[in-house]
Amino acid sequence: TNVEGDFLDLVRLELNPKNPDEYGTPDGWQAFTHRTETIAIKGGPDQMVEIRETRWGPVAEEPLLGGPVALRWTALDPEAVDLGLVWMDQARSVWDALAVATRAGAPPSNVLLADAEGHIAWTYMGRIPVRRGLDGSVSVSWADGRTGWTGFIPPDDLPRVIDPPAGYLVSANHRMTDDTYPHVIGHAFANGYRAYRISERLRAMERVREPDLLALQLDTTTELHEFYRDLIRRLLTPEVLAQHPELAEAREAVEAWDGRAEKDSRGVALLTAFRRSLAASVFAPFLQGCREQDPAFAYDGDLDTPLRTLLTEQAPGTLPDPARFADWHAFLLHELERTVATLKADYGLSRVDALAWGVMNRVRMAHPLSDTIPLVGRWLNMAEEAAPGCGQCVRVLSGSLAASERMVVSPSHHSDAIFHMPGGQSGHPLSPHYRDQHRNWSQGLPTPLLAGRAVHNLTFRPEPASARS
């Protein structure tokens, strides 16, 4: 699974005022190197791309806040890409596999391992930079030599867990190390709700079989939204409802919520929209400076930790728009009223407690060409449909965010293995297999991993050399 780490830095370049083709380095001014890449276009002329290089990497095509930056990225480092994973099939224990994984050059990933002796392990795979003088969260100059990368984390220093007391391992794109780990891995990990829910389900299982783990992957419990449900409960007291009777349906909506994000779940749509509205309004004063520099700026980190802290403390100094609202209570009432009105208008409802989650949460899978050729979208895209799950559910499914694969397989029990994939096995829109797997993936129906009897054969024949000349 994805580490959600930070393996790219934008190095702010200091240009020589007397020669803009030179940039500052710890060794003084250095000239950019220039190279041309040729992009072959099928059926058309080759395209030439001019690239300026620095000692840290290529200069980005777009400036950052008006200034040039270089891309220092592990993926562009020859040392970070190799075929080391081919040795994994020689591993005979988790210790062998750990040695292979931690030394392989590949996109950084979470690696979970198990062996025939019952040992299990987790680690990171891929090259992760060792930073000096910076944590990678902002763009800075490396010209003075006090900041930059000093290399990659040595394989033996990569974090790992072997045979944990719980007897299982969980990886859900969340942070896997604590503050004692000396190296920066990232800044924008997924929050821990999905990982916590997976742990809860595994802890409760006495025996683990394939249907149990498929059911786990289809779990739609969303504990993240409980905070916002309780916030509405505290806000809408009988006294407040007497003054704002139009909000009674909001109280009824959250009381009707079953704690899940199923298609027919009531209340979770209101909680989702309320959370989104609160985040936009509460963070607006803090992000104003960012948006003055870049109107398209979007805060894309773990918003719930700071948001919940601000909503819990309700300090007068952090009240959004104090000229308009006397206190946090007035602000929260306004946000809830606006959220209810917006949902009713957007979905044509007379009551917000009638809004089912599937009306709001719809899965959209579009082919890249459908945006450029809209008329063919109906043949290229998967049908838009109501979907269970959410961004914080184990069954992650919200808009364009969804599980790209579900699989449950146990060695020596391949006949019981389960596999899900969206779309189909063919990439050809006219093939009967273009979308033949989508229904089972969408509805969570058990689908065998093993192919079974062949029903279709596809033969690849190399093009004759004469045809290529």
Each PLM stretch: what is its role?
Residues 1-469:
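C-terminal/peripheral segments of proteins
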